[in-house]
Amino acid sequence: LQFKPGKKYSYSNSNYNVLARIIEKVTGEKFTDYSKSFFDDLNMLETSFVERYMGVIPNKASPYSDWGKGEWWETPMVTKTNGEGFLYTTLRDQLIFEKELQNSENDLFIKSQKPIPESDIKTYGFGLKLEDRIGRKAIHHDGVTLGYHSQTIRFPNEKLTIFILSN
């Protein structure tokens, strides 16, 4: 550890890969199977983590990059990790998840949108940034991998969420 938990903040995608492995050990299931069951329970039928990075994903938006040279090319997916990324979804499924977050009494959903208990850090929760944006309480996070970018910004008091997806 770099510091005592709850005293400092250092973002690391690797932590989510470790968490996925812990879930596998505790449940005895592959992380992709466990998460698929979670999404299916919410009726998010078009959401899953990539299992085979060369596999066909129906209606997938292809990633593009100009590699800094001004000419756009489709970007190959060259890695596959679970926990920190490579989650595919649709706007329909994101809306289902958002409604669940806004209306849920699920303790995990509620805690994920608040600062970590007994922590000196008040601008980060369980995987989510907690800040004021345009004078309003905002809960947000982005995701970036070569050729893709996503951003979700939630204004809970207004029951407003903005999704930005690009490739």
Regions found by a protein language model. Give the residues of each.
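Short, well-ordered beta-strand elements
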Residues: 151-167
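Short, surface-exposed loop or secondary-structure junction motifs
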Residues: 1-146, 150-151
